[in-house]
Curated annotation (Swiss-Prot):
GO terms for molecular function: 23S rRNA (guanine(2445)-N(2))-methyltransferase activity; RNA binding; rRNA (guanine-N7-)-methyltransferase activity. Coiled coil: none annotated. HAMAP family: 23SrRNA_methyltr_KL. The keyword Magnesium does not apply. This is Ribosomal RNA large subunit methyltransferase K/L. PROSITE patterns: THUMP (PS51165), UPF0020 (PS01261). The gene is rlmL. It is found in: Cytoplasm. Specifically methylates the guanine in position 2445 (m2G2445) and the guanine in position 2069 (m7G2069) of 23S rRNA. InterPro entries: 23SrRNA_methyltr_KL, DNA_methylase_N6_adenine_CS, RlmKL-like_Mtase, RlmKL-like_Mtase_CS, RlmL_1st, SAM-dep_methyl-trfase, SAM-dependent_MTases_sf, THUMP_dom. Keywords: Cytoplasm, Methyltransferase, RNA-binding, rRNA processing, S-adenosyl-L-methionine, Transferase. The lineage of its organism: Bacteria, Pseudomonadati, Pseudomonadota, Gammaproteobacteria, Enterobacterales. It is an enzyme of class 2 (transferase).
Amino acid sequence: MNSLFASTARGLEELLKTELENLGAVECQVVQGGVHFKGDTRLVYQSLMWSRLASRIMLPLGECKVYSDLDLYLGVQAINWTEMFNPGATFAVHFSGLNDTIRNSQYGAMKVKDAIVDAFTRKNLPRPNVDRDAPDIRVNVWLHKETASIALDLSGDGLHLRGYRDRAGIAPIKETLAAAIVMRSGWQPGTPLLDPMCGSGTLLIEAAMLATDRAPGLHRGRWGFSGWTQHDEAIWQEVKAEAQTRARKGLAEYSSHFYGSDSDARVIQRARTNARLAGIGELITFEVNDVAQLANPLPKGPYGTVLSNPPYGERLDSEPALIALHSLLGRIMKNQFGGWNLSLFSASPDLLSCLQLRADKQYKAKNGPLDCVQKNYHVAESTPDSKPVMAAEDYANRLRKNLKKFEKWARQEGIECYRLYDADLPEYNVAVDRYADWVVVQEYAPPKTIDAHKARQRLFDIIAATISVLGIAPNKLVLKTRERQKGKNQYQKLGEKGEFLEVTEYNAHLWVNLTDYLDTGLFLDHRIARRMLGQMSKGKDFLNLFSYTGSATVHAGLGGARSTTTVDMSRTYLEWAERNLRLNGLTGRAHRLIQADCLAWLREANEQFDLIFIDPPTFSNSKRMEDAFDVQRDHLALMKDLKRLLRAGGTIMFSNNKRGFRMDLDGLAKLGLKAQEITQKTLSQDFARNRQIHNCWLITAA
């Protein structure tokens, strides 16, 4: 009896043990990452030919303690390598693991290689050559703490390489894991199987091979035993012949069918090629199709299983599309696949919850470094009175109502950017802004008392409902999570896409960036204030302080201002302001842009302006500003400097976002100024719910 070890992906060990026992293995013992077992020579070959789950089958040769590199060398050399290699056989060493002595796996592999070569030269035998790419014999050494385990890898290449996939092709899941997913899916061979996001077809091909009794090793050309002296070619040929006979019989007798689709025509072509090379191409129908067009291929029965490994993302900006995809799949399953089973394998359990289905079973597994889950569902048969379920139905109804109200109003106003929803319902605490045919969903960070998983699920429901109600493409929804604005956080950089969208606001054309910053370059709540500035600016010298992207300057320029001066500390935003001005034909000496600390510039400037717009931060302690600034505390000092720059008969429009801001009217009077609050006049319909989003004042000489 041979003592053997079969390695596998984490989480599949028990499944592999059952598979090996069914092949005839005895004394199976599960350990992390594999199964120790025993079997005769025939079982060695059968495990190589028939195991769908094993990554490699190895023949342990011995162990040694490693306290120095000499210990490793002598421990390896103690094995009788000359009796193991056929004459002229090439070899390669795979070394994994480190300890205090062997700190580099390449060094460990070199020591093992030297020991094997020296074992031949000491007996005056020809030394075997190393062939890293296609060796006849693979030696596997695993170092754990002070113990090195040495084994012969009888597989050669990993057993996931079945021989039907082009090695150059990238597979999101290995064939061994795909086989496990099929086995755990609840699918019964003989019933239909459909994968609506099949990629290169791995799940369907593995299922078809299982269903038709086709050995996974049947199409492999190379093995790790070809240079091994104990290889029994006669038994191997018997095992191979039996596998070929069973495959022919299984294919001839199989009557059910497999269906695969994907939106990428190139991967569908690869899937067809892979299925043909695997010998089961005639059983699978592959189509280029998007999930949105998914339809039941057998509406009159029989029932089958939908099995897939849908995409999952690691970046926030990929989530809206994925949420929409999973929500859509859930709806299609309920509407068209009543009575069917569904099994999905994913690294994102939160995305699976977007299906709005209850799982009957779930399994955990590793896909490389990723922790994954497989969930199995049974889709209830639909009845005549079944109503489609909408995620976040209360939110969806409110959004639908708001859309009807604001869409017509915005068209009449001549604006493309407006707020559609502003935390109207407390449990759906988001803002939804439309920018032409794009939508930005801003989630206010939930309090720590709210369960993070529930908050995330609610956000997913919101995104799914938003896409459904507005009828937008998922890739035109941008998701942002933000805390209530706190000073400098307002301008936090999020990304580097550099994608700008041109939008219109009344008669102005403006650039917005929906992805790279917390804000987009256009404060929607200041829209009416900007229009008022345009109406007030004809023939006047206009100053814009804390200008951000200069949208107020654009309105003033289009309103006929004699000159505009735009001041901000950020070079990024000044360059953005320049692009906005250029987009509207506002160029030349009459339109100055100044990069400066606005407070310092204000103290030093001695020019005169007819119209000044200032929208300072509520609080700022930027390193580039000379002093910390608090708008409540410091607004009088600000007005004192502004008065010096204000030409006789001129006007200051002063705005800020501090909730509960109190204008010091007595202090203003002492400066010879008076203030008129115009906040209500500057709040448009889409911000009517949020009366405190900003406050706005007109200040003139008393």
